[in-house]
UniProtKB/Swiss-Prot annotation:
Record's keyword terms, sorted: Ribonucleoprotein, Ribosomal protein, RNA-binding, rRNA-binding
Lineage: Bacteria, Pseudomonadati, Pseudomonadota, Gammaproteobacteria, Lysobacterales
PANTHER family: 50S RIBOSOMAL PROTEIN L4, LARGE RIBOSOMAL SUBUNIT PROTEIN UL4M
NCBIfam families, per the entry: rplD_bact
Similarity field: Belongs to the universal ribosomal protein uL4 family.
Function: One of the primary rRNA binding proteins, this protein initially binds near the 5'-end of the 23S rRNA. It is important during the early stages of 50S assembly. It makes multiple contacts with different domains of the 23S rRNA in the assembled 50S subunit and ribosome.
Name this protein carries in UniProt: Large ribosomal subunit protein uL4
HAMAP family noted in UniProt: Ribosomal_uL4_B (MF_01328_B)
Compositionally biased residues, Polar residues: 42-52
Record's GO cellular component terms: ribonucleoprotein complex; ribosome
Renumbered residue ranges of the record's region Disordered: 42-70
Record GO terms (molecular function): rRNA binding; structural constituent of ribosome
Amino acid sequence: MDLTIVGSDNTLPVSDVVFGREFSEALVHQVVVAYRNTARSGTKAQKSRSQVSGTTKKSKKQKGGGARHGALTAPIFVGGGVAFAAKPRSFSQKVNRKQYRSAICSIFSELNRQGRLKVVDAFDVEVSKTRVFAEKIKSLEVVGSSLLIVSDEISECLSLSSRNLPCVDVRSVQALDPVALVGSDVVVLTVGAVKKIEEWLV
């Protein structure tokens, strides 16, 4: 299949495996959830009754005082421990390499079908000015609230001029992830990035 290059009459032949495969919602959902869970720090911690600082002396005598109680560190008391206290743990989920790559291909294919995938010859700016970068984006005539630009090489000028725009994300091919692709309204790829993506996924 061929992708039209924005601002040119030329087309770019691309692999059907990457940009023309059937969309698998279940696979994409599985990979996105696993990716987000793996990014969790998992440092939540609470103190159980054995970890709370306080005396373990019986608070009152056994008989004649109503409900029977022991230590004041029990979860029922204010200042006591937490029942079933949370402990630090890993939320990471294993995803097979084939699954991950298939999900990325599936996302690219669906973006292409929906007209949310654009290809440009190159995307670079000569000066580190946000205004110049914004004008370049405007010339692409993309419609959407969030824009992801994937380039084979990111110059210092491109990085500096784009970082002040809240709804624009500039990444290299190596920094691509399924969450960034799914969360973007429009994805712009350079020709060099397309070739690197095909080398990675095919």
